[in-house]
Amino acid sequence: MNLVSCAFLVIFVPFMEITFSQKESMILKKVARAAETLGVETFLIGGFVRDKILGRETSDADFVCAGDAILLATETAKQFNPVPQVDYFRNFGTAHIRISDGFDIEFVGARKESYQLDSRKPEVEPGSIEEDQARRDFTINALAISLQK
């Protein structure tokens, strides 16, 4: 995704036009810069994408990466001034940043899940972006925008 400095950012998706506010563009640039520094494929996912398609304002964004989400959150936090606290949940491989204006940013590593026949609790292990998307239900959670393309 080519991120440019402007009052808003427009991304063209086949048959769709998605517009980002100046604040959203700034956040996306910082996450994209951190992902590039770490060399991890990263996608904006879920409700944020839905809200942008519908032309709604947002107050949070979720990202999935093909790698260490906690490391990506830590690298992203360094892009802000002041540097926000990174809350992480090592058991789940997730992290959270709240920037100074109250905007929440969540990070999760791509994963795949498998189930034993007698259990509803998944066995979780790191996976590819494709495996992560395949495990999601076919609703809002499966929407994604690449930060690299």
Whereabouts are the PLM-identified features?
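Catalytic cores of the polymerase beta-like nucleotidyltransferase superfamily
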Residues: 5, 11-149
